[in-house]
Structure formats: C-alpha cells, structure tokens
Amino acid sequence: MALVKTKPTSPGRRSMVKVVNPDLHKGAPHAPLLEKQFQKSGRNNNGHITTRHKGGGHKHHYRIVDFKRNDKDGIPAKIERLEYDPNRSANIALVLFADGERRYIIAPKGAVVGQAVANGPEAPIKAGNNLPIRNIPVGTTIHCVEILPGKGAQIARSAGTSAVLLAREGIYAQVRLRSGEVRRVHIECRATIGEVGNEEHSLRQIGKAGATRWRGIRPTVRGVAMNPVDHPHGGGEGKTAAGRDPVSPWGTPTKGYRTRSNKRTTSMIVQRRHKR
C-alpha cells in the first residue's frame, strides 16, 4: 500500500493523492455475496430529504459483509483475496472456510492472501481472529466490536480504526474507543483482534469536485449564502455575517452543542469523549 501523487496534467489532478494497493483483487467481486443497492439520494419513503448533500454517484452493488462471525466457530478458514469495497473506507477480505463456504470480512491491518483466520473462544490471539471479549487479554487492540451480544460489529469498522480492551469487571468489559470515550460492553460481545486495514485512507486527497460527486456527495451550501426562508443565517444586502451564533438550518447550535438524547444507554459510557 502506498500514496501516489498524480502528475499535474490538469488542475484537478495537481493536488490529487491516491492510495494504491497492488494486492487488491482486480477482477469482479464474489457474485453470491452481492446485493442490489437502490439509490435513495437522501430521501425517505415520502420523498422528503432526510439527509442533505446526497445524490448522484456511481452505481455499485452492496457487498454482504459478515459482522457477526458467530456461526463458524472452530472451522478453519483462510483469506482467499483482498478486495476494494465502494461502500466503506476499509477493504474487505474474501474468506474461504474448510466447509467450502465463502464470506466477506473487514480486512485487518497486515492481512495477506493465504493468511489463516479463526472464529470462536479457542481462536489464537492473532490479527483477524474473532473471539468473545471474555477470551481476549486485557490491553489487546481490537476492532469490529459488538455493542449487544449477537447483533454484529458496530464499533471500530472504518479504515485505520481500532479500540483497546482496558478492563473486565463482572459481566462487563471497558473498551476505549478512538475518540477517547470509554464504554462498557458485555463480555459475551465479540471483537476481532488487531486494527482495521487501509490505514492510509485518511491521507488521500480527492483533488477535484467531480471525484466527490462520483461518491454520491453533493455540494454543501453555506447558510449565509441562502435566503432567510432557507436558513437562519440567510438574507441581508450584499455579503453579510450570520448575525448570530452558528446554528443548523433548524436552529440548533452547531458548535459543540450536545444533542445526544439516548438516556437508556448513558450508564454504559464510563468516560465521555468530550474533555468537559
């Protein structure tokens, strides 16, 4: 994996930096693990925009990734190939099990073709292996961590991310996330050893607006450039300041204002990611 700066043959390519991985599979993905993905462009079933700045982009299939990894315990497997996934920042690995089944998993850092991977409580503590947290030594770097047992991985799934198992107390373990938050999870939740691969993803430079449009992301218009009917910052003769503290289009403060309302799981957060 390497960062490659393109030749400045145009203004768009002048500042472009790509992440190149020659080990990625260059052919088609594994067809039985593909699903159609219909474009919603940020709209709900009423046609109303629920997520702004979405639309367009290249068509692609969804790759069915196994985030649970709980029904192949004890069955040997090996990485058959590494693949690009347009649906996420991390790469994925096609794993072939001894019983002949193939599945996609998130490719861990350092994964190579032919590497053995294992699932279950007896799996060795090695990158790419998936175990219950009760069987993982304290201090181990982990990724693809479950929040609820059996629900599938929800924490530390994007490129270059990881978490650290800090402690185990009774039926709960404490995990420190990349954001600095320390969270309690049940010891029966599963996690994968190591970090997520493609760690240079954050160093890429997209280079031009069109490449962002290929990804299905539309432009973000500033509130002060809108009319008063469209945004609290809008209006005014000529170029004017917002005239108030920054807010969202719906009037919610947008600089550091906390909007978390899920009191049911607040007790599971040992240390917040905020410093104050």
From Swiss-Prot:
Task: List the SUPFAM superfamilies hit by this protein, alphabetically.
Answer: Nucleic acid-binding proteins (SSF50249), Translation proteins SH3-like domain (SSF50104)
Instruction: List the biased-composition ranges (Basic residues).
Output: 50-59
Give one GO term, molecular function aspect.
Answer: transferase activity
A single BP term in Gene Ontology: cytoplasmic translation
Q: Which InterPro entries match?
A: NA-bd_OB-fold, Rib_uL2_dom2, Ribosomal_uL2, Ribosomal_uL2_bac/org-type, Ribosomal_uL2_C, Ribosomal_uL2_CS, Ribosomal_uL2_dom3, Ribosomal_uL2_RNA-bd_dom
Record keywords: Ribonucleoprotein, Ribosomal protein, RNA-binding, rRNA-binding
| GO terms under cellular component | large ribosomal subunit
Region annotation (Disordered) maps to 37-59, 224-276
SS bond partners: none
Q: What does this protein do?
A: One of the primary rRNA binding proteins. Required for association of the 30S and 50S subunits to form the 70S ribosome, for tRNA binding and peptide bond formation. It has been suggested to have peptidyltransferase activity; this is somewhat controversial. Makes several contacts with the 16S rRNA in the 70S ribosome.
Report quaternary structure and partners.
Part of the 50S ribosomal subunit. Forms a bridge to the 30S subunit in the 70S ribosome.
NCBIfam families annotated for this entry? rplB_bact
Give the similarity note.
Answer: Belongs to the universal ribosomal protein uL2 family.
Annotated protein name in UniProt: Large ribosomal subunit protein uL2
Q: What is the species of this protein?
A: Ralstonia nicotianae (strain ATCC BAA-1114 / GMI1000)
Its gene name is rplB
